[in-house]
Amino acid sequence: MNYVPNKKIINTMQTAICTVFEKDYHYGVGALANSLYHHGFRGIVWAGYRGNTPHWAKFLKTENGYQEFSLGEGCAIRFVKLTTPKHLGFYKPDFMCQLWENYCPDIDALFYFDPDIVNKCEWDFYENWVSRGIALCGDSWYLVPANHPRRLAWKEFAQNNGFVCERELDYHYNSGFIGVHKNYKSILEIWQKLEELGEIAGYANLQDLYNNNTFNRYPYLYGDQTYLNLALMLTNYPLSTVGPDGMDFVPGGTIMSHATVPHIKPWRKKLLFSALNGNSPTITDKLYWRHSQTPIQLYSMAKILWQKFEILCGSALGRFIRRAPM
């Protein structure tokens, strides 16, 4: 009988993960790291932060330019202090470029996750995914046709700044996750450049992610996400995309779960109060608390038991009390 080697064993792709956070978003970083570790990720999570390192990151080892926290066998979080005045949402492409240039130049692929995401699938799925193209998840605002007036305005902005549109896209992708192979990493520089051009033109304030003056003002460049989607139009790099189910924006997702605006972050949510107001615990809420203790212990056991009680009661209340859809 011929021996067929395990694909996980022969896979030699070198990958890393990164995120950025400040304030209480460290809770999300902990749950994200736990969920990735639980599903087989072994390697380095680079965490750019503003403020202080998390209270749960004990026994930090200081290295050249970062502090390392051991997560478990073969896995660590490396905290990189950020001094940028930019809103961290706008800093995503900068941080990824900085990592590739100064911290992990030899990796084959780099993944960014927002710190309010919880992973749901095995890590080898991501490595296979990014080998097929730039990995992306559809946004809740998914269908944005090539002839949509907002997309045409984005295109005009790019052309007025010397860019050429390489392809037409009909779908809109969430900037809370991206996986980039080293062959396509210049997409990050384009994303970064577009944001900076937007600020120069007065269409963005890079210290204010959701400037209310931009969403309804031509050319409708709103937050970092619009600039990412525009950057995708300006290259012909292959894309490998999933729909909004990829982040649990619609039922049936199996990849990750994302607590986006306007939802309250799981670590802040009063689950019983929310359920009494017609909002029962979400999939993301449940996953967050499921991955809040191992291998990183984010809370006391008393807190965890109370949250399990709130999830149980909140889910039961949700069968009888439900907010009417918009």
Tell what function each PLM region has.
Residues 3-87, 101-106, 300-326:
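N-terminal anchoring/stem segment of glycosyltransferases
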Residues 10-12, 119, 165-168, 174, ...:
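A glycosyltransferase accessory/donor-loop signature
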Residues 29-30, 89, 93, 175, ...:
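Conserved glycosyltransferase catalytic-site signature
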Residues 38-42, 101-109, 114-116, 181-187, ...:
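Secondary-structure boundary elements
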Residues 46-48, 109-114, 119, 136, ...:
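A structural signal for short, well-ordered beta-strand segments and their strand-loop junctions
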Residues 57-65, 145-161, 200-215:
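Charged, glycine/proline-rich intrinsically disordered loops and linkers
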Residues 90-145:
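GT-A fold catalytic core of metal-dependent nucleotide-sugar glycosyltransferases
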Residues 127-193:
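Conserved catalytic core of nucleotide-sugar-dependent glycosyltransferases
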